[in-house]
């Protein structure tokens, strides 16, 4: 009867209203539907909501405690229940928890992507081996540096030049200081011996080709400085790797290294993609604006490209990993974690001292973040290339690489957690400033 009387109204046609079960300050929804052309329904809603602090439950938004009739295109009426009797509808609960889940995934996208890559490599190594066959690792590395070129602002290059003292320290730390940690690693007695030898070689490597830059970008550090240190250390590292491996790993015995091949590979996978990305940015200003307005999207694409590396490496090493005793492998993993934490502590203290001498401005903080991340990581692809070219001079190639795969994954995960902590601390600080 109520609906019929409402439909009969000439002043307010198709006004559908159901009051809450009991009087009070509840949400009321008015929906007016007009049919000016006889074919298409046009709806307008007017909503009066109860204050959120009076709604039972812990949901930070208001709910409708009424239902409404909505006409369909075929002339039928559909009733939608939006809650009632002061309760919260199941759809609203699902919406809230869905938003919370999406927010968590967005805030922790990189570690989730890395864990997913490792899990996929263990669950189905066939896909990872197929991706390795078609050089997806090189493709993902090229993709990361193309994105780095796309997001590289010209003014950031000037900031990188201004941060040359920290950048120079980063190069010295990567190429001259941190390789000496391999001497301590070689003192560890662990069988098979290749596990320790592999970590020693890993310690002599330059910084990661992609993850340091990607993490610097996520942390809001000086990505241009991170790029400069990454490219320079990997190109110069071709000259320093033979010396350190011969001195600390081979006991002074000379070993042959594929210097020319490594140099060409790094030029193709690092420098050329970076230049291509920068040229595209400078050539198409509209696309540059699109990149600047969607930096979070490109950061997620960076994270996906980065997760391909552990996925492929775990897929390749799965059978070998299962053949090693868990106790021995966990010990090697622990050594890798301890190595990365030691590098972080050493570089953090050194950077703090150097930053105190050069000044503690905001730009100095961004430079410190970049140098700390890139100077504390070691690259896996270059290590794999070096070991493969040595032809088994230090033992089984798979066993040499296996602990380094774990160390590579652990350093990325540790640093991604560290970056997330920095981001949350920055959000809390900005919130307190706004509140004050």
Curated annotation (Swiss-Prot):
Residues 1-47 form a transit peptide. It is a multi-pass membrane protein. It is found in: Membrane; Plastid, Chloroplast envelope. The keyword Membrane applies. It comes from the Eukaryota. The chain crosses the membrane at residues 109-129, 131-151, 157-177, 195-215, 225-245, 257-277, 297-314, 328-348, 403-423. Keywords: Chloroplast, Membrane, Plastid, Transit peptide, Transmembrane, Transmembrane helix, Transport. May function as sodium-coupled metabolite transporter across the chloroplast envelope. PANTHER family: SODIUM_METABOLITE COTRANSPORTER BASS4, CHLOROPLASTIC-RELATED, SOLUTE CARRIER FAMILY 10 MEMBER 7. Belongs to the bile acid:sodium symporter (BASS) (TC 2.A.28) family. This is Probable sodium/metabolite cotransporter BASS4, chloroplastic.
